């Protein structure tokens, strides 16, 4: 689960992570009032107006502006709220700006990168620091890897003092800045583990000319599998930032990711789902989604899956590819037939079922009298997808 920058900073602040003073605003008038308050409390001649969307690259897209007065903040907020911000992470459709973060201005001396995430290869957390603050860390790792330090942290023992100091040394911090940097890194790691985050990213981490170490931007992602331990975090979810179909799928516990293709797919198992997407591509189509219904696919699960797939108007055909190991193919076939009757399928559905009771399942589909096309293997399924698209 993703959250907004201001929400992430609010959580980090509770763990002693230093963040700038900031106030969230949902209207231009609220933004002006927030600016008035900040100008009274700060010595900086400017405040920062930051669009709050679930995407990076806001600065380059015009989503971060400096203002020298509350009146200027009001004007910026009027233009920014309700506007669509297009960044390299939003796609061409962009995201609508519905809230702003008004933040105190900083007298910045240096900018760095600091991030913590899970490294599945080593089964450990990895602390990453770079002298290239404000840059995309993937680009830094590819083009200037010598400017990036990775420190693997054993999740059992946690972050050790020498590791935090090593990271601060790498950034070239000295004296009071060094001590503040170590304290910041330790506080961030504590927050990351306590809240069960999958990512805690500070980009940039800034050193002010007064020696303060602050998170100028913060990105926090939660591990969805651990959200049951943090019931208070559910209120932080902003469904307006999510794809409507992906949100509906999450309510039915379906693993669904929307893509930009024309062939919907319903599969049990992530590996088979990825293979099916390749099959669709090789057949001349483009996958419209990733949908894993899991090992215990039921009639209700299948019906919900069809509803979500058909919610995408670009879908011209559907490929159902099920391997019946735990789940029985005849049960899945029954679910497909029932769903087809209830929903009223108007696009061709190609169904490939292999495994337990596959023969019975094929017979059920053939005798259903519905627009269900059974396939007897991957090659046959590919050919029938191709044919369905040609007549769509």
UniProtKB/Swiss-Prot annotation:
Keyword Magnesium: yes
Annotated GO biological process: succinyl-CoA metabolic process; tricarboxylic acid cycle
Pathway: Carbohydrate metabolism; tricarboxylic acid cycle; succinate from succinyl-CoA (ligase route): step 1/1
Ligand binding (Mg(2+)): 203, 217
Binding-site list for substrate: 268, 325-327
A cellular component term, taken from the record's GO annotations: succinate-CoA ligase complex
Residues bound to ATP: 50, 57-59, 103, 106, 111
Keywords: ATP-binding, Ligase, Magnesium, Metal-binding, Nucleotide-binding, Tricarboxylic acid cycle
Domain ATP-grasp: 9-248
Cofactors, names only: Mg(2+)
EC number: 6.2.1.5
A Pfam family reported for this protein in Swiss-Prot or TrEMBL: ATP-grasp_2
PROSITE patterns in UniProt: ATP_GRASP, SUCCINYL_COA_LIG_3
Cofactor annotation comment: Binds 1 Mg(2+) ion per subunit.
Subunit note: Heterotetramer of two alpha and two beta subunits.
Family: Belongs to the succinate/malate CoA ligase beta subunit family.
Role summary: Succinyl-CoA synthetase functions in the citric acid cycle (TCA), coupling the hydrolysis of succinyl-CoA to the synthesis of either ATP or GTP and thus represents the only step of substrate-level phosphorylation in the TCA. The beta subunit provides nucleotide specificity of the enzyme and binds the substrate succinate, while the binding sites for coenzyme A and phosphate are found in the alpha subunit.
Protein's UniProt name: Succinate--CoA ligase [ADP-forming] subunit beta
